[in-house]
């Protein structure tokens, strides 16, 4: 039923809970798990230029963050492979909900398993959370790990 499971992960406790759930489902259905790590842009190139922020310095910072994330993900991938679960790792930058939905479509994901970011701000009430936007935009089922799980 679920051949490919997409699991966006940021290495925070909720996304680790989502990964555990994705692993359980992968065992049941002999699924492939795609780990997706996204670093959101907090400022566009135009905003950086106007703020006199160096695009190259931020690019260097992103590379540093990406290398650290890749190292952390290699550990998770080894765990998955030890459990005989086929896996793939993808690193992207951009708006999380856009990237999640796009990768799910590109990789023909049958299921997205994700955690919530845990924010309870007024902005989330009006703008919505990443998980909410993914649920609204995705063409495949989305399993969201709620707070407290």
Features from the language model and the residues they span:
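Small/aliphatic-rich secondary-structure junction motif
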Residues: 3-56, 83
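Gly/Ser-rich helix-loop-strand patches that form or flank binding pockets
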Residues: 102-149
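General small-molecule cofactor/ligand-binding pocket signal
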Residues: 36, 88-92, 143
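Alpha-helix-centered segments that form part of catalytic cores
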Residues: 66-78
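Structural beta-alpha unit
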Residues: 78-112, 149
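Short beta->alpha linker loops
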Residues: 68, 91-95, 117
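A short acidic, glycine-rich active-site loop
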Residues: 55-69
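Generic structural signal for helix capping and beta-alpha/helix-loop junctions
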Residues: 43, 97-99, 121
């Amino acid at each position: 039923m679920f051949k490919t499971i997409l699991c966006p992960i940021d290495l925070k406790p909720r996304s680790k809970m989502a990964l555990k759930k994705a692993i359980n489902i992968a065992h049941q259905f002999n699924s492939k798990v795609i780990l997706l790590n996204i670093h959101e842009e907090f400022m566009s190139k135009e905003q950086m230029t106007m703020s006199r922020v160096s695009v190259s310095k931020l690019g260097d910072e992103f590379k540093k963050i990406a290398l650290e994330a890749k190292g952390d993900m290699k550990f998770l991938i080894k765990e998955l492979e030890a459990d005989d679960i086929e896996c793939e790792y993808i690193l992207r930058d951009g708006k999380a909900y856009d990237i999640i939905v796009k990768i799910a479509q590109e990789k023909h994901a049958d299921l997205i398993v994700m955690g919530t970011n845990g924010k309870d701000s007024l902005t989330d009430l009006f703008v919505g959370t990443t998980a909410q936007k993914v649920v609204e935009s995705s063409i495949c089922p989305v399993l969201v790990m709620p707070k407290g799980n």
